[in-house]
Amino acid sequence: SFPTRRSSDLPLFGWAPGIGRAFFQSISAFCNAGFDVLGDTQFGPFCSLTGFNNNPVVLITTGMLIVFGGLGFIVWGDIINFFTKKSEFRTHSKIMIKLTVLLILIGTISFLVFEWSNTSDGSIGTMSLPEKLVTAFFESVSLRTAGFSSVNLSNLTDTSKAMSCILMFIGTGSGSTGGGIKITTMAVLVFSVFSE
């Protein structure tokens, strides 16, 4: 399980460089860029966030920044207007929020099911339940467009890799900082198939 206080909570790179890397990491996460700011560290060369796969603060914070950046500026405009002007959400924003939550849930559950007993190096099979849940959430969010990873992707099961490709293809929202065909485009395709 997650310890409450440990030495890894202290800056890995020292205070000044650590704050700089944290700032860049935050921007990279919000922009769904996935740049490896760690480089060659004690965790290995170009390891993304695999060294933090047992640190819920890093994974949840990075994951939520990815989600926020992936919603798109139209949705954020509606959220701001909802709280400041009490205006209603547009249809686009309603679809984006609902499908983002749905894709995160589907991705998280799929990752848990497909990787639960995978004990390959860097996978979640040997993790505790809280670590598995946080890692599955993070991978579900990150694989859609950001490119960060907290597990060794080469050791995932083939089913997880296929699911990753589907999530990557869908991507994030229109007007967002992420990629993919966009969630709303996927929604239009699905609705048009089932409407006939």
Regions found by a protein language model. Name each.
Residues 1-196:
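Membrane-proximal intracellular helices of multi-pass ion channels
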